[in-house]
Amino acid sequence: MTVSGRSSWQNGKTTNAMRAGKLATERDLESANYGSRSVEKLRHERAVGNLNKGRFLGMNKWSDEQLKHSMARYEDLAATRHNLFAVIMPSGCGKTSLARTYGMVDVDELVSRAEHDQYVEMRNEIVCGRGDWHDHNTLWFARLNQTLALLDYSVPVVIFVHTEETALEIGARPVACLTLETTAHEMNISGRGPKFREFSRESLRSCKPSNRVPNQYRFKSNKELEAFFLEVMNVSGLPVGAPFKYSTSIWNSSYSRDVPGWILRGERAGTQQVSINELRLLFEQGKIPKECVDYYVRASYVPTQFDFGVTMFEWSQALGQLPGCYNSRRDFDTLTDLMGVFPPHSPKEVTRSNVTLRTLCHTFDILSMPDAKEIASYHVGEGHTLVTNLLANWKGITQFTTVSHLVFPWFKVCERDWSDKMKTLHSLVRCSKFFMNTRITEKDRQALMYMDLLVGRGEYTVDEMAEVELRTDDTYNTKHLSYDPNRQVFTNQQYKKDFITSVEEAYVRLKIEPKPVNVDGFIDFYHRRASWLTKGGLVYNKLPPEMKKFGGQVFDAIYNTCREIQGRHNKKSLFEVYELAEVLQGANENNFNLTKTQIKYEVGKKDRTLLPGTLVHFVVFTYVLYLAEKQGQIGSVRLNTDSEVDIRYFDKKMCTGVFHVLYDWADFNEQHSAWEMGVVVDYLKHLIVAPRDYAVFVEAIVAGMYNMGLHDRDGNVHKIWRGLYSGWRGTTWINTVLNFCYVHIALQNVERLFGVRVVLYVDHGGDDIDLGLSEPAVMPWFLEVMDAMLFKANKWKQMFGTRSEFFRNTICDGRVYASPTRALASFVAGDWEGAGRATVKERVVSLLDQIAKLRRRGCSEELCQGLTIATISHWCRIKDGEDWLSLPAEIIHGHPDDGGLGVPDRDNNFWRLEEKVPEINEEWYKVVVPDYKASRDYVNVLARDVEKFSLVIEEREKLARKLSEDSYDIEKSVDHERWKHLLNFRTRVIAKELAVEPMEDSVVFEGFLEYEVEEGTEKKFDLASRYQEFVSYLSLNGRAITKEELLDLMSDGEVCLEAIEFQGDIYYARLVPEFIAYRATMFCKEAINKGVCDAISAQLFFRTICWMSASVFEHAI
């Protein structure tokens, strides 16, 4: 082994003193005049012709002027990159391998693959005499510095480069130049193509750094080179994993002296003997550096664990993709029509968006702010929603993070590449509590996730054949495997046995405690269709066009006018007009389970496809699930269980000592075989106490699993072999039950293979899993088993650690968090599906709920307050003739008790009005709908149900007509007609009251903290409130019945009317997550019902609980 060709080590051996004398010292690294000494050396070597012997990356082309420029660049950059250190290694010497292993930066990864290939081609052209090194270097170094400007240098960063000149140009201080002898080098490059081999050889020949570069050694093997590299890291005081892997001669100051030797030596890496959790604890105690934990995590089966594993290698690789995606900065006139400067891609970007650039300019004068103007200038000509989102996100969220200076350049990425690049960065942020080298809070982590969604919603052409290919197979059977303990191998036969057992386990409560359902058969169920049909789209159907439309009238009794209303049927209104036989004409076994592709209007423009089932399939599946969903909980999943806002789902995850496996499936829907889906549904007919015809409908659904097809836009039908449709009535049921079965079998296999049972709880629903374990060592075993069972997952998306994440809610350090960026992206884009049918009050409530969510999650108060005023003003407009007129401010900000909408003004005040807003009497309007068949049948069924309590429904036809009005999509039209009468309302504001003010009472709050919801409490209140919505149509013994009398009848006198009518103060409820507001409501209802307080006192209790919960718990969800 030679030392840069200048001297040799005797027999390849040296003393520690000799080695230390040749290694970089901290004093060398901190020497401020390294650059000036280096430039003189380079000038001298050029003068004697040393540089003229090589032709690699243009070293023989440097002039004195270029050298001066290079050193000037170094001195400028070294000041800001004082923690950037370079290891010089020619191509083919293993720099990428070392960078990946030890989590460092590889110069070749600082550009995208396409850019890298372009630079390689340029070099090949120059070597062949067709090109200029000066042009190449100017572009190359400038491009490297673009990426390096994005990195975090708060702690030392090591970069592997080809040459000393590269180090100078990027402001890095060389600590070593490590090369291989020819034989070892040739072995390394033997697998490369001819051009790359020649490039690597030229790189090695031309690597002749100045004498100022310390530690210039040539090695016989990769192992020797790696050993010396670690010694360089040790003597330089740079943190690195496995510092004593080859030698213990030089201590690394990043480690405590009492760290176990096996950790220092990097032993057991990749084995089950290593506890990543123990390494994490050592890091938290300050005994080992992050690089040590990263080293072991990266060697394990799971690339990220306990927030470790994401290194500067991944960060630099991801950030290296950004500069090539930057737009050029373009100036624009801020006073012109911004819709022209930033054009919307779709009319819905204008008609459905809650926020536009005009909103931001009018409310905040946002483009007068230099940072916002700069961001916008990089996106001239790009989508309106994207630019709106970027400005709102930066000013309301991102600029307040501790790493905002590092994130700001991201906002230059063009719209075309925004989503893809931000998804990659989202994964790095999600899997770590470090933003590169900076440890960030959970609040900041949440703010920096989901930035890919800022691109908004969009319309696109579905790739139908891609959906077919995802679901193409050669069998209906499952190909999943399970471990056979007898044969000691994973087999499909064992999996099928285990799957049947897991389904039985999932449905065990249905077998042990079956619950009868008040349905006599399908006909009885059909007569109740007004209660189970939804107002969703008609999905896939064979209806003629004329059957999909309806017409109605609205009579205005005040102005004596009649307005014709035309609309398209939804599922509910269709069955008001047509009977089942008419709707299902032409349905048969061949088209029973077909689908067509539809757009999913998701934020982030994910271009995912909605696959709805047929209308007849919907009806059949609804009957099957109508009975199943009234049974007990399914396994440990969130089916037939407590409300999603039950605090127990969150409370049990706030304790310490639990380790979480957050498994992320890849294309979960497509992994299910027809056999697995069929078994999940088929078992229902054996377990549910059901009418005789129930089994026929179950079997129809099961048979349909084996006869699926996709009807494309050209009229062709393509065979579907596997996977469920995302728009089935039973999609959630099948996904969730299969989630349970898959995990149940996997845990069984873990026990068979490793002999451990450490599961504390399993929480899963849909395709989400949160597996709570008592022993962290089992976590990677679970992933290994899932892989062995042939389930598909993205390893980089798996989260193993102490943090819980479920349904995009994160529980960490006793608090619940969710991403403000995700909520903002959805809010700005608006609802592209259902918002068009919302009434004014519904829209106002929805907007206030969404803005409250933004506020809780950490959006700035200024942004939230401004968006409240702007969006409410926008949507509280009524069309009168050709004009859109705003509702009077008195109505918008008027106190609800005075008939106002109750929107707090800029000062968070309600307005008390001298004259109340006139109540819009429903008798002013009469809506004539085409028919009300479903509602009429439902009223007849209700009549039979209430007869059990000696109650009679009076005026059945009137009630049926009234119920049917809700089936048609006419609310908005009727609502606007009503509000038009109030456009000219004016009155004097006599006082203003704070919507929310501090409320504190430690006694009440302590009582709330000790409160436990008794089993059956919610059910008790639900049963007591039965039929209250029909009370005005009910009679008992020939006379009208009161609310109190009906309540006594339904609850046997156990519940009082004040308790079931108590709702809490919505303005205080918005201060806290739903699970706290729900619990506070139940607490107050119980207090009223038990006579502890009246409704007025309960309202004070509720406000106090919400106010104190917000300040004490600080949940950000």
From Swiss-Prot:
Residues 1-23 are annotated as: Disordered. Residues 1-17 have a biased composition (Polar residues). It is an enzyme of class 2 (transferase). One of its GO terms (molecular function) is hydrolase activity. Keywords: Hydrolase, Nucleotide-binding, Nucleotidyltransferase, RNA-directed RNA polymerase, Transferase. Its EC number is 2.7.7.48. The keyword Acetylation does not apply. InterPro entries: DNA/RNA_pol_sf, RNA-dir_pol_luteovirus. SUPFAM superfamilies: DNA/RNA polymerases (SSF56672). This is RNA-directed RNA polymerase. The lineage of its organism: Viruses, Riboviria, Orthornavirae, Duplornaviricota, Chrymotiviricetes. The gene is p1.
